[in-house]
Swiss-Prot record:
SUPFAM superfamilies, A to Z: P-loop containing nucleoside triphosphate hydrolases (SSF52540)
Entry keywords, A to Z: ATP-binding, Cell membrane, Glycoprotein, Membrane, Nucleotide-binding, Phosphoprotein, Repeat, Transmembrane, Transmembrane helix, Transport
GO cellular component: plasma membrane; vacuolar lumen
Cell location: Cell membrane
Gene name tied to this protein: CDR1
Disruption phenotype: Leads to susceptibility to the antifungal azole derivatives in azole-resistant clinical isolates. Suppresses the development of high-frequency azole resistance (HFAR) in a medium containing fluconazole.
Family to which the UniProt record says this protein belongs: Belongs to the ABC transporter superfamily.
Protein induction: Azole exposure induced expression 4- to 12-fold via regulation by the transcription factor PDR1 that stimulates gene expression via binding to elements called pleiotropic drug response elements (PDREs). Expression is highly up-regulated in azole-resistant isolates. Loss of mitochondrial functions leads to increased expression. Expression is temporary increased during the intermediate phase of biofilm development. Expression is down-regulated by the transcription factor STB5.
Protein name per UniProt: Pleiotropic ABC efflux transporter of multiple drugs CDR1
Membrane topology: Multi-pass membrane protein
Domain of life the protein comes from: Eukaryota
Binding site for ATP: G893, A894, S895, G896, A897, G898, K899, T900
Regulation of catalytic or functional activity: Inhibited by clorgyline. Inhibited by RC21v3, a 4-methoxy-2,3,6-trimethylbenzenesulphonyl derivative of the D-octapeptide D-FFKWQRRR, via the interaction with the ectodomain. FK506, enniatin, milbemycin alpha-11, and milbemycin beta-9 also inhibit CDR1 activity. Inhibited by milbemycin A3/A4 oxim derivatives.
Gene Ontology terms, MF aspect: ABC-type xenobiotic transporter activity; ATP binding; ATP hydrolysis activity; identical protein binding
Amino acid sequence: MSLASDKKDADVASTTTTAQDDDNLSTYHGFDHHVQDQVRQLARTLTQQSSLHQKKEHTLPEEGINPIFTNTEADDYNPRLDPTSDEFSSAEWVQNMSNISNSDPDYYKPYSLGCYWKDLVATGESADIEYQANFLNGPYKGLKTVYNTVVPSTASSKDKNFKILKSMEGAVNPGELLVVLGRPGSGCTTLLKSISSNTHGFNIAKESTISYSGMTPNDIRKHFRGEVVYNAEADIHLPHLTVYQTLLTVARLKTPQNRLKGIDRETYARHLTEVAMATFGLSHTRNTKVGNDLVRGVSGGERKRVSIAEVSICGSKFQCWDNATRGLDSATALEFIRALKVQASISNAAATVAIYQCSQDAYDLFDKVCVLYDGYQIYFGPAGKAKEYFQKMGYVSPERQTTADFLTAVTSPSERIINQDYINRGIFVPQTPKEMWEYWRASEDHADLIKEIDSKLSDNYDANLAEIKDAHVARQSKRARPSSPYTVSYGMQIKYLLIRNFWRIKQSSGVTLFMVIGNSSMAFILGSMFYKVMKHNTTSTFYFRGAAMFFAVLFNAFSSLLEIFSLFEARPITEKHRTYSLYHPSADAFASILSEVPAKLITAVCFNIIYYFLVNFRRNGGVFFFYFLINIVAVFAMSHLFRCVGSVSKTLSAAMVPASMLLLGLSMYSGFAIPRTKILGWSKWIWYINPLAYLFESLMINEFHDRKFPCSQYIPSGSVYNNVPADSRICSSVGAIRGNDYVLGDDFLRESYSYLHKHKWRGFGIGLAYVIFFLVLYLILCEYNEGAKQKGEILVFPQNIVRRMKKERKLKNVSSDNDVEIGDVSDISDKKILADSSDESEESGANIGLSQSEAIFHWRNLCYDVQIKKETRRILNNVDGWVKPGTLTALMGASGAGKTTLLDCLAERVTMGVITGEVSVDGKQRDDSFARSIGYCQQQDLHLKTSTVRESLRFSAYLRQPADVSIEEKNQYVEDVIKILEMEQYADAVVGVPGEGLNVEQRKRLTIGVELAAKPKLLVFLDEPTSGLDSQTAWSICQLMKKLANHGQAILCTIHQPSAILMQEFDRLLFLQRGGKTVYFGDLGDGCKTMIDYFESHGSHKCPPDANPAEWMLEVVGAAPGSHANQDYHEVWRNSDEYQKVQEELEWMSNELPKKNTNNSETVHKEFATGVLYQCKLVSLRLFQQYWRSPDYLWSKFFLTIFNNIFIGFTFFKADRSLQGLQNQMLAVFMFTVIFNPLLQQYLPSFVQQRDLYEARERPSRTFSWKAFIVSQILVEIPWNILAGTVAFVIYYYAIGFYSNASVAHQLHERGALFWLFSCAFYVYIGSLALFCISFNQVAEAAANMASLMFTLSLSFCGVLVTPNGMPRFWIFMYRVSPLTYLIDGMLSTGVANVAIKCSNYELLRFSPAANLTCGEYLGPYLQTVKTGYIVDPSATDTCELCPYSHTNDFLSSVSSKYSRRWRNWGIFICYIAFNYIAGIFLYWLARVPKKSGKLAKK
């Protein structure tokens, strides 16, 4: 079977199919790159199922033959069974496999599965209306949600729950196809999920019965999950895998034990993959990446085929397809359904398909149909009887309306036609969902259905159940548990997933290479930073040795932090494959870990070898390998920990908060920043549970044990003390013993950290235990954590609007048209709403002053050329046309004909290539104001999710209507637009995101509304306004366009194969064939008669009276799949009388229209309607409102700020003025900056969302300039960062105790104010660097990596880890250019300066004075030389106690910090912020502002 003929397929040339047998019946040969040819073959071959069986009996032996051929020259070779042959026929292959299975039932164990349900009721939590969370109510709303989850509600279950599906019944027997029809929101998706046992997010009532030929949904979920499969709309795949790799993995995981005799597992899997690719037209894409929205790969249509091929390989007996034909035209959708029919007939499988736009030919293939209306089942039965059933009910089917469209139109009050005869005769016609449901339940068809279901449910299925179980066990591999739903064993799952993961790594090897090179570079940079101070193995290296070791363990441990990103990419795929019973999620998790081991080892080897030897750690083989072993344990322990965090989090942003908190806690309590002996009592437990603490301890013992470090500095020192006895001076290092000229490493560790050598291997053992513990925990979480549950669509309103609506008692009448929120609406209110809406639609637009187009827009000989691989390709070829006020013009053509390209050229939206020809407005060239004088409704509905409908419309009106129009007039005009678009019910609803906000139709109306609110004076372009919509919504959008045209608006609209009824709404048609060539431009006429007459008069076959004129025309010109034109209709057009008339009209327009009087004022021709300052004001207000209504973003910013600063503040709580206290205060300032990464990563996605919306919609329509966009981003972010900086200051400054230093120095106010300025400046700096990095980067991850690198380098060279005096001369420039140098210097000096130091008892150096001297006399010369330090008791003669420092300013000098530079430092840091913002603005202009527009080339 084939799927959509997409843009890639469109370029494939078709060849004529010839009959290949005596029955003049062409055989279906599968799919290779000639997709269209094959579509036609399949369509012609499989129309009659009996013919198919007849054909098979003539060509295949009853017992079947082995289809895996090793020799194509052998006598038994059948090319129709060989997927690599051009003659391959998938239908014959399926029949052959069925024959083989039936020939040996004891081995292959064939079986079948049907599905029967009775009294099926689905319920969801009542939430049809929500108030919008904002910065103030966000925490309350979140706590209320948690409370409601934890504490059972006292409300009745009726209040809490509502029925999504009301009581319904159904039966799908083996070999049958069921189509489910209904408008969006009717419950189609919920029904499919219910009968496929995928009920996340809603509940099935206890009284409901669902039977799968005797099995319960619980049996399916636990033991036979793979037999019942639900295929969702979205096509989610691993983007970097090729099509072949994606499908081969599925085939390997589904290869049965009872496969073809004599064929090994791998050969069978490869054959199955080849068959699937040949069947679905994917053979030519085998080595192409599947891709996604960001990764370039196969086309959208081909990706849809990959999804279908996956399900096909799974071989499920009951398949549920949710809108699987979305985005496919009717011809290719037909082929998909035909192939489903063949599969059902031959393999005895059953399928249920929910479909939105269903052609008559497709409908006729279904055995049964189920019609849903707002959760009510209003018909279930034979597809052939449904139309008659509703006609009997009292509804009329218009001429040329398909049966499927008629059945869904019955559920739409605005579209259904009630039989006038019934009304005249007073016969009751059911109209509300409940009335139709009651009519259905009283009908004979319902009674027949109940009889069928009861007979099926009462059947004895014991034999059938045993058959299914035997078949399942026979398919399972040897080591698989019989009760397991999976086909292959756990070990084989890991093996195949490991292969898949290695493919992924190979396909994206650039990432691994970047990590290796990046980490190696960091090893060189960091290692060389310590090179000078670690050159000599003396006591002077003690601090730096600890710092370097701390850096090593942190860098290795946190190198796995970014693994969280990849977890979220793969999660939906794993969840999908779990429902297909391909593998355990834990098997995928374990394979993922194993596959990354080589990359981790290579990265660790490259980093650690370079770093270890450059830093000059201990040169000993055993010591090095122990160092490497400990760091490898750190890598895996943290990798598994971060994976655990990711697996319990619903979203990436939710995972980053705990990950950031862990990062801070683990690093601060590792033993370096604050030694274990100095940790405050209440927080010691953090050290005991911290794996990094034990690993750091082992590394330090490994480095220092059994070493003598020569003393680098003695106290006292100087020429006066050269001849004093050894016990009269001491080494200045901790651990020194009086009289020794060295310090033992073990003594230093014991005194400084309380580390003992006997604990060396303890760290390794505990680290390994953590690795195993986190691994097991991660696998358990992956296996049993269901991930984010899907929500139904709900309308969201701002809280003040909700209050007002409650007062007006409107809430019960407001409902979003969707699947999971339509609750029980009383019959009366339902009728009232129907009546109200019909009254409003009658009145709406009667007296509305919509903008009327006055000018005629016309183009002549329009050509568009682009360079592709050094060749010039013509996309549009001499296209002519016009759009007049009050007309609705359709633009049609096959995929790849250039429809959207023509719109973009006419609207000046192309940024590459060369456009030639004439494009004129009333005979004059387009001016700068043209882009804002038109409305352009894109195919994607792009809106700001936090705005309401009314706010979105007003924003467009304020900025795009002329500045001289008053605000009152603009507001009134917006109200007019709301009325004509019939959006009054949800005018104050928040746009939201799909699922929580407006539904598809409402979004499409808003898209049109935003363009109308701009009051376009020329015309409105609409690109595919009906794509992805059901036929009823498409109809309502088309009616809306007609209404606009009737109000004098000029409209040009591209449309993809409209229905006959839709087609009749248009006035004119411009039809393009492939290559951008015109085939027809002219009136359509009543019932498209003018257009039909044109083609019939120029040699086409007659249009059948019941045919869709659009499909007939596509077939005539050879644009439908498999069709061929009997002549070149472009040449026919160029030689026709109609073409000459078009040329004459265009000539008249060019000559006469310029004579019209037009407004030539300067404001009319400006690029933007309003000034830059006004734009900045409005855009900033909107952005501020967005921030206010995004509590997740703001509260995570403040939560992180509060947590980080409380954590740091209470770790170093009220640090004293001892040496350790000063060290702690310096490290506290250093740790203050680690919030940089988490805050930056939160901001970047927010900016990217804003920018994408601006560049896709607001910039092309000239709503506001790029200057207003970028300046508003800066202006709105700064106040929130200042607020966060203020919160940080209040917590941090007082907790650490900086205020007490200022108080003692009598500088409380100045130093407090300056510290607050530094704190705010740092938070603003984070925002400025984020803007600088993202301004020119396309994706947030790239900007985050760049900013993280810059921050790491700034932090490394800021002077804390290594003082500038200790750095190699080469790196001094880095110290000077690092912005954190000035921040930390300023904060530290402001925090601790001008106070006396008081050493703790253990920090005092003790030694004996020279004979007959007091300590004061003995140390006097030394203290005068060093100018710091104090003696505890100068008069002592026995033991001198000396504190090395006497004043905090002396300590500051030792770390190159000075209090006198405090204001200079703040000023320099502010300059860095200004530089970041200015550079960000410049880089945005340089990289992302278009320097040319799609203007016409000068001739």
